[in-house]
């Protein structure tokens, strides 16, 4: 019997997943509702339409997103092949002519003899091997189906995330490890502020520029998740009873309670990343770096994921997904793209690549691939399936997700080069075994 897989959604992840399947001789039924039913963000009927920027970000190997793109090239990614062919001058970044980019992918995928395209909205999850790659604007009917499958509490409709910081960039001389009232183990890094420091920070925060909202995002805001800058505008003391509450956080150096305290909570199993507790924000990225850099200890903080608040549909992957992108409760069902909690065009495509390879292996009754954590593709899969279940938020690829090198290297560029070299050696070994 001919082996086949349903792929729902022909965005970046779905197109990549479909390509990886047909490359391995597996028939694909590809479902895409556009143009029969449009989303509020898409404008064409093309596959892998880029709805926001035309940049796929940095190309160099001293940047994690450059490494993931190189890994994808090694694994014959259709998305990266299209991007390389449609590239436009952009300095050290990979930017594309968006029409040429999506046109190339549409042509290659649609016209492949093993692909059957169904232009219709999917409202029920089909039987049999399936990849769901319906993106951040998944239609309500299908979102309801996913909710039934994963459990209501594990599907989210908007993304409200605080910035995440690389631990190595925090000034440890200015912060201290402590939990409020010393309850349990000392689990938080605390950034103490004097009244003068707090007042200066407050003034900068309430006058900082916020990012513009897209029309289709406006209804999702403030459902019990208020941006820090909105909270601050309610009064100078409001944050002191919220995320900057100093009670129970006496500074062990002075024995006194600071005027205000920001807590940083460990965000990954390896303890290399920390998030700013309660600091979900809609400030522009440059403003986040400037304003949050006024907090003692964070003057030179390396923000690996800026705070965002936007419309998104994603599952609680640490609870419901395997590192192979399979649903824990139904092993012939895979998820890919932003729906899984990976953030960004390239990351979405990379998850589609991994899901496509694994869905092909599943129908061929071969062993599924868990990408090594030292690869960029593997580090993302590892993060989204092992991050905190309670505070899970989508994540871009970054070197903070990679396991540390055996030998510690202080110089950032050299460290990144070594991480990249290790990642590419590992992905080549994976490619040889596929």
UniProtKB/Swiss-Prot annotation:
Biological process (GO), any one: tRNA wobble uridine modification
Reaction equation(s) it catalyzes: uridine(54) in tRNA + (6R)-5,10-methylene-5,6,7,8-tetrahydrofolate + NADH + H(+) = 5-methyluridine(54) in tRNA + (6S)-5,6,7,8-tetrahydrofolate + NAD(+); uridine(54) in tRNA + (6R)-5,10-methylene-5,6,7,8-tetrahydrofolate + NADPH + H(+) = 5-methyluridine(54) in tRNA + (6S)-5,6,7,8-tetrahydrofolate + NADP(+)
Source lineage: Bacteria, Bacillati, Bacillota, Bacilli, Bacillales
Predominant location category: cytoplasm
Entry annotated with the keyword Cytoplasm: yes
UniProt-listed InterPro entries: FAD/NAD-bd_sf, MnmG-rel, MnmG-rel_CS, MnmG_N, TrmFO
Residues binding FAD, per UniProt: 9-14
Molecular function terms from GO: flavin adenine dinucleotide binding; tRNA (uracil(54)-C5)-methyltransferase activity, 5,10-methylenetetrahydrofolate-dependent
Family: Belongs to the MnmG family. TrmFO subfamily.
Reported function: Catalyzes the folate-dependent formation of 5-methyl-uridine at position 54 (M-5-U54) in all tRNAs.
Cofactor: FAD
Gene Ontology cellular component terms for the protein in this record: cytosol
Keywords, comma-separated and alphabetical: Cytoplasm, FAD, Flavoprotein, Methyltransferase, NAD, NADP, Transferase, tRNA processing
The keyword Transport is annotated on this UniProt entry: no
Subcellular location(s) of the protein: Cytoplasm
Cited Gene3D superfamilies: FAD/NAD(P)-binding domain (3.50.50.60)
UniProt protein name: Methylenetetrahydrofolate--tRNA-(uracil-5-)-methyltransferase TrmFO
E.C. numbers: 2.1.1.74
Gene: trmFO
